[in-house]
From Swiss-Prot:
Keywords: Cell inner membrane, Cell membrane, Membrane, Transmembrane, Transmembrane helix, Transport. This is Spermidine export protein MdtJ. It comes from the Bacteria. It is found in: Cell inner membrane. GO terms for molecular function: amino-acid betaine transmembrane transporter activity; antiporter activity; choline transmembrane transporter activity; spermidine transmembrane transporter activity. Forms a complex with MdtI. The lineage of its organism: Bacteria, Pseudomonadati, Pseudomonadota, Gammaproteobacteria, Enterobacterales. GO terms for cellular component: plasma membrane. It comes from Yersinia pseudotuberculosis serotype O:1b (strain IP 31758).
């Protein structure tokens, strides 16, 4: 659970950092650059913590995808950017992709405990001796030099 919180914090930090970058470029104020540097750095730190338990592909898709959606909305509201029908279609497609990636994440089933901790494909196999060569057993499929 904590790793998903790290991912959420990474997304929030990325959004703030990216919007601060735009603010700094529009206003020319140094404050935007400083906020951007700290937030983008914090975003990567939180993302690196999140991927300890959240699959990298899922974490990155959510981090970028949700970030793009929210940054686009705020860019329209705060910076007067426009949303064309093609951009809207792209955002809807992005939402669908995020949902598909997230729904495809399942915890892997715990492997069954087999005797001797051998994988099932090796369990029933027994070594077969095919013959003797100067007192040395030769196993099938292997070639041993006589000593």
């Amino acid at each position: 659970m904590i790793y998903w919180i790290f991912l959420g914090l990474a997304i929030i930090a990325e959004i703030i950092g990216t919007l601060s970058m735009k603010y700094a470029s529009v206003s020319g104020e140094m404050t935007g650059h400083i906020v951007m540097y700290f937030m983008i750095t914090g975003s990567y730190v939180m993302l690196s913590l999140a991927v300890k338990k959240v699959a990298l592909g899922v974490a990155y898709a959510l981090w970028e995808g949700i970030g793009i959606l929210i940054i686009t909305i705020f860019s329209v509201m705060w910076f007067g950017e426009t949303l064309s029908p093609l951009k809207i279609a792209g955002l809807v497609t992005l939402i669908g992709g995020i949902l598909l990636v997230k729904s495809g994440t399942r915890k892997p089933k715990q492997p069954n405990r087999h005797r001797g901790n051998r994988p099932p494909s090796v369990q029933g196999l027994k070594t077969q001796t095919t013959g003797h060569h100067k007192g040395v057993a030769v196993e099938s499929g292997e070639h041993h030099a006589a000593a």
